[in-house]
Structure formats: C-alpha cells, structure tokens
Design a protein with these regions (language model features):
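Electrostatic cytochrome c docking/interface patches
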Residues: 29-53, 70, 127-153, 173
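Flexible coil segments in periplasmic/lumen-exposed cytochrome c-class electron-transfer proteins
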Residues: 2, 98-168, 185, 198-268
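Gly/Gly-Pro-rich "capping" loops immediately C-terminal to redox-active cysteine motifs
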Residues: 48-52, 64-108, 151, 163-205
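Hydrophobic membrane-insertion alpha-helices, especially the h-region
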Residues: 14-31, 252-253
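Short hydrophobic alpha-helical membrane-anchoring segments
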Residues: 26-34, 258-263
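Long, compositionally biased, intrinsically disordered
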Residues: 1-6, 23, 27
Length: 268
C-alpha cells in the first residue's frame, strides 16, 4: 500500500493516468464507430432516406419499425436487397392480410425506383444477397449442351415442387410451388438465392451462377415449345387427349372384354 501511495505522488502519475483513459476511450470508439457510421450513411443517402420513408408506411406495421419482425411477419435483418426486389417486383408484397402463401400479382404495384429505394434501406439492416447484375443470370450465348445440362439440374433440384416443365404444383398446408412460365430471369435468380416462403435457399456454393444460367435457359426453352391445343396437364399431355385415351379407349376395351366373356358363357 505504501508502494502504491508513493507511485501516486510521482510526477508522471497524472499524465500516465490521462493517457490510459484516452486509450480506453479510443478502444470503445473503435467498437462503436462502425455502427454510428452505418447510421450516418442511412441518414445521408437520399435513396436510403426515401426507402426508409416508404418502408415506414408500407412495411413497418408487419415487419417492425426496425425490420426486427413481429408475430405477423418475419425479420428483414439480413435478407438483403435481392429479397425485397423479388417480393415487391413480383407483387407478392406488401400483403394486405396474412395468408398461407403470398400470391403473385396480389399486392399494389410499385415503381422500380420505389422498390430500389426500399431494397437499399433493407440492405442497411444487415448483410444479405444484393440485387444481381445481368451478367449473373442472363442465359445469352449458352450452347445446346449447356441448356440440356440446365434441364438435368432443374429436374434434380426443382422439378419435385415446380413440375418437370416448371408449371408449378401443390405443397402441404395450403401452399403451392408457383408456375415459372412467365417469371423473369432476374426474379428466378433472386428466388434461388433468397428462398422465398417455403422455397429453400440455393447459395452459390450449392448452385454456382453458371448452373443458375443453365436452369434459366432451360426454362426459357420450355416456354418456347409449341403448344398444340387442348388443356395441358403440366406437360404430361393435353387433358382432352388423355381423357379420351384413358376413359373412352380403355373403358371401351373393358366393355368389349366383358361382352365377349358373357357371350362365351352363354355359348356353353
């Protein structure tokens, strides 16, 4: 104790104490300043400011004032700008009321500028997938072999839910896998990377961009296939032809077989 008392009386004690205090303040600031800088960027970026205003009006009642989520909707922290661009670009969001699945083209239409602004704001809440550049999803220039490989990838990873030709199908609990017939290449890419609703996330480790391009090219080729009329049954053939083939054709053969059996029994 006498040693410490002697040290406190040393002429260098006060300057050293001051330096130690300044060092501690610097360490605390280095931890806090990134968050403060992020908040400052949010407050000064015009697009983010616009997006925050739109978010407060259209999204916060379900997703929370800070995107933290509520009992009605999930958190948006870390979903990224791509999720916003997909959900609002396909008019699945904002929902007017909770339901098992957000249907396409059910929400009010927003301009791309408004969608970009909300996406920019949501991107500040946490790191997530960004809106992709066209080079990431454009299938232009792919060979026939690459398109055929896209079909194999689609059948392996997607057809169990979306049907072999991307026509969609039913899922448990009132949900469904939507048709991919008229979905843009960008939105297909964003859906794979963000996993909307019941869909799993396919990150670049699971499906590299080249694989995604090949899948998109395969779906584009399916859309260009000629249609020969009739009510189609998910690419399995027109319903009308199937009806005649199975019900009338096979049914007729069964009736003929029964008639022949009865005729043979009478002859005996």
């Amino acid at each position: 104790m006498r040693f410490l008392s002697t040290r406190r009386k040393h002429p260098a004690a006060k300057p050293l104490t001051l330096l130690l205090a300044l060092f501690m303040m610097g360490a605390v600031y280095s931890v806090v300043s990134p968050a403060e800088q992020s908040a400052a960027d949010t407050n000064t970026n015009p697009q983010v400011v616009q997006g925050k205003g739109l978010y407060d009006v259209t999204c916060s009642s379900c997703h929370g004032l800070n995107g933290e989520g509520t009992s009605q909707a999930p958190s948006l922290i870390g979903v990224g700008a791509a999720a916003v661009d997909f959900q609002m670009g396909t008019r699945r969001m904002p929902l007017s009321k909770p339901m098992a699945q957000a249907p396409r083209d059910a929400a009010p239409e927003y301009t791309q500028e408004e969608i970009d602004a909300i996406a920019a704001y949501v991107a500040t809440l946490g790191k997530g997938p960004a809106v992709p550049a066209e080079s990431k999803y454009s299938p232009a220039g792919l060979s026939e072999e690459e398109i055929a490989r896209g079909g194999e990838l689609f059948r392996t990873n997607c057809s169990a839910c979306h049907n072999i030709e991307g026509r969609g199908g039913a899922l448990p609990s009132g949900a469904y896998a939507p048709s991919l017939t008229n979905v843009s290449s960008k939105h297909i890419y964003e859906a794979l990377r963000t996993g909307p609703q019941q869909m799993p996330v396919f990150n670049e480790g699971a499906l590299p961009d080249q694989d995604v391009k090949e899948i998109i090219a395969y779906l584009a080729e399916m859309r260009e296939q000629p249609q020969h009329g009739g009510l189609e049954l998910g690419g399995l053939g027109p319903v009308s032809e199937g009806f005649y083939g199975w019900i009338l054709g096979i049914g007729g053969l069964v009736l003929v077989a029964m008639w022949l059996a009865k005729k043979g029994a009478r002859a005996r």
